[in-house]
Amino acid sequence: MESENAEAENVVTGNLEAKSKEGKNMQFVTLSSAWSLQALSSLLNPEEEDGFDFEQGQCSFTIGAMGPGNIGPPKAKESKAIPEPRSDESENIWNPEEVPEGAEHDDIWDVREIPDYEIVFQQTVGTEDVYLGLTRKDPSTACCQELVVKIKLPNTNPSEIQIDIQEMLLDLRTPRKKLLVNFPQPVERNSARASYIWEAETLEVRMTVQRDLDFNIS
């Protein structure tokens, strides 16, 4: 019995020694691979050779992290540029240029009614235009001299009408009515003429259109 136990112990001891040798051999192979990668990296980057720690503890710590990506110079970290705010940016929720002209005159709390209105272009046509064709006039709005705004104001006293005319805007107020009109073309504000037609209960405002074309005979 004692001889059998001794033989069993010898077998177990032999197996442990064999496994220990295999583990040492694997560790040696792994360490050799790590040393080879570090040596190759040192050849490619001689100026960084002093920065490497070849001690066994340091080597064993970096074994798992070594790979083909460690060969060559270290990758520089990409720095993301933070865009600086433009000097023209402000805390406004919209650009002042995007606000339509006349919006500052509008009041959402004003409950006055908006009257009906229409915009009409008019032009003066003479015999030289109809029969002789001596000018370059045509029926388009570009050839019209006047812009007429007709506003329905029933039961309104003309003395109660307040009107303000800008180059691209008409602002009309009465005790019961309110109207803001944006013109399709700029007008000469000093040329405005207003008249109230009692039969039609309509206010007509005539203004001269600012024209780029000149239809006078040269």
Swiss-Prot record:
Q: Which GO terms describe its biological process?
A: axonemal dynein complex assembly; cilium movement; flagellated sperm motility; inner dynein arm assembly; outer dynein arm assembly
For the region Disordered, give the residue spans: 66-103
The UniProt entry's GO CC annotations, sorted and at most eight, read: cytoplasm; trans-Golgi network
- Which stretches are tagged as biased composition: Basic and acidic residues? 75-89
Q: What does this protein do?
A: Plays a role in cytoplasmic pre-assembly of axonemal dynein.
Query: Which family does this protein fall into?
Result: Belongs to the PIH1 family.
Q: What is this protein called?
A: Dynein axonemal assembly factor 6
